[in-house]
Swiss-Prot record:
One of its GO terms (molecular function) is hydroxydechloroatrazine ethylaminohydrolase activity. Transmembrane segments: none annotated. Disulfide bonds: none annotated. It comes from Pseudomonas sp. (strain ADP). It catalyses: hydroxyatrazine + H2O + H(+) = N-isopropylammelide + ethylamine. Its cofactor is Zn(2+). Homodimer. Keywords: Cytoplasm, Hydrolase, Metal-binding, Plasmid, Zinc. It comes from the Bacteria. The gene is atzB. GO terms for biological process: atrazine catabolic process. This is Hydroxydechloroatrazine ethylaminohydrolase. The lineage of its organism: Bacteria, Pseudomonadati, Pseudomonadota, Gammaproteobacteria, Pseudomonadales. Catalyzes the deamination reaction of hydroxyatrazine to N-isopropylammelide (dihydroxy-isopropyl-atrazine). The enzyme is also capable of catalyzing some dechlorinating reactions.
Amino acid sequence: MTTTLYTGFHQLVTGDVAGTVLNGVDILVRDGEIIGLGPDLPRTLAPIGVGQEQGVEVVNCRGLTAYPGLINTHHHFFQAFVRNLAPLDWTQLDVLAWLRKIYPVFALVDEDCIYHSTVVSMAELIKHGCTTAFDHQYNYSRRGGPFLVDRQFDAANLLGLRFHAGRGCITLPMAEGSTIPDAMRESTDTFLADCERLVSRFHDPRPFAMQRVVVAPSSPVIAYPETFVESARLARHLGVSLHTHLGEGETPAMVARFGERSLDWCENRGFVGPDVWLAHGWEFTAADIARLAATGTGVAHCPAPVFLVGAEVTDIPAMAAAGVRVGFGVDGHASNDSSNLAECIRLAYLLQCLKASERQHPVPAPYDFLRMATQGGADCLNRPDLGALAVGRAADFFAVDLNRIEYIGANHDPRSLPAKVGFSGPVDMTVINGKVVWRNGEFPGLDEMELARAADGVFRRVIYGDPLVAALRRGTGVTPC
């Protein structure tokens, strides 16, 4: 049994519906669960013996403001090596041209590349207050091998991140309408068999689980219908969640191919419900949003790609008004060069403000955007044990010193600050499952520079030396160092 007392927080944003902020509080944690939350816990809990055990670790948090840990509901970790490639900017290419350029690069990925891409992405998320992350790993190229998600769990264990792994796939060949090279295609049977293997080996259904598996075919437009039908059947048999991309520009192709809009297509194949959440959704109409609410289907809103792609802005006010579960995701590095989920809170808020005059429903309050990144993410992942700071919830939180110059004049309302002002850099502390995994610019027990050097070395060996990638990097006008 491990007990830790986090003592002396200046403020604590609970993340509850009421927006409760507590002043001068401690958090008492036992085996990853919050068992006490309030002022002067050593004194108030002493009569019942709580926190009096031998060996209680005390962590001084004086001057810090605590927030519930952020929950990332959509990412593609494997794309870390295509960041900051200006020749691949969406502003210069149509979608098909972009796909023709980017997917041959993705096909270079091997097992080491997946591992180090995952370390890089997870570490950046943690530095900015993320405590739980879902990754949609659909890249199974010929070079990758069958154990890519296994290596992602290795990375999560190294860093201490709570991890939901999405085992994705592409099953439709290019000859039948897919835009993805056949070298990255799998059969439905191969995909489903590996989902079963991963669930058997890694999925933990218990409260406070650190690792879970999600069945996540990539998109209806690049998969056979039976891939989705059988995915839904298998996931419900195994008791795990489902995820895919939807409403991100594929609807015209779906109507042309099947005579159905994307969401209707999914509903007719059993791929909606309280165990399903969908990435993006900027194409969803009022009728679609009503169906999402009626079926209990969630949405992962990724604001950063909207700026890059110039697409429609997901109607978050309408979804909120309808009661749709909404969480936030950073998305992959190919459409968001950053893994900073805290930044996405402010981006999402600003996007909705930009579109406010065109919307039927008002923009949610700034605090609601923090809740989408916390409780909303927990709801999408079906994790009632996460998303807020309260007794009985997981001890996942981050903390920031709001007395710095960049927050002066704004720190009177810590609830609204993440959306209105944003955090200017890494947080001061991130705690996951009751353990400090990031504090004062360091990953305890790990050498960040060594992690960076190892990843860079693999990227140089596997990716940057390839003639195609070398040409793309030269296209920036800068000689790679």
